[in-house]
Amino acid sequence: MYNYLSGNHFDKPFLLPANVCPVVPLSFMKAGVGFEFIDIDESHAMSTEKCLTAIEAGKYSGLVFVHAYGKKYDNKEFYRAVKSLDPNLCIIDDCCLCIPELVDSLPENVDLCLYSTGYAKFIELSYGGYASFRGYEVVDY
């Protein structure tokens, strides 16, 4: 995620869910990309309603959606609504707690999808993870 953030020169902050792993905001800080926290809902996921309201203001470069506790949410409609408000807004799908999937394409409207292989994950290699992003696949050891 750090390489993606630092290599794309985002000039506005991202929205992060309030319950995100501390590694995520640290990666944003190291990359020099701003962020703001947004509340979570009763499912422990980012409040999509509050997120869409915030995005309407046009002051964000993107958002990170965390699939809390490894539960894979169906976000097609939410991501479609986000892109309809701002097609240039970057959507990072944080699946770090989910069972890793090796797929040939990203979910619709997702710009970066992350999986972790670090400590206490479904596939534990003790370190790292991998990401897929629009047009490329990257594996980082």
Can you describe what each PLM-predicted range is?
Residues 82-86, 106-108, 134:
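Short, conserved loop/helix-junction motifs that constitute active-site signature segments
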Residues 4-86, 90-92:
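PLP-dependent aminotransferase-like
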Residues 1:
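Donor nucleotide-activated moiety binding/catalytic core segment of transferases
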Residues 93-130:
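Conserved active-site segment immediately N-terminal to the catalytic lysine
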Residues 46, 74, 100-102, 123, ...:
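Active-site-proximal flexible loops/turns
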Residues 136-141:
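Active-site C-terminal subdomain of aminotransferase-like
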Residues 18-20, 39, 95, 116-117, ...:
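Nucleotide-sugar donor-binding loop of glycosyltransferases
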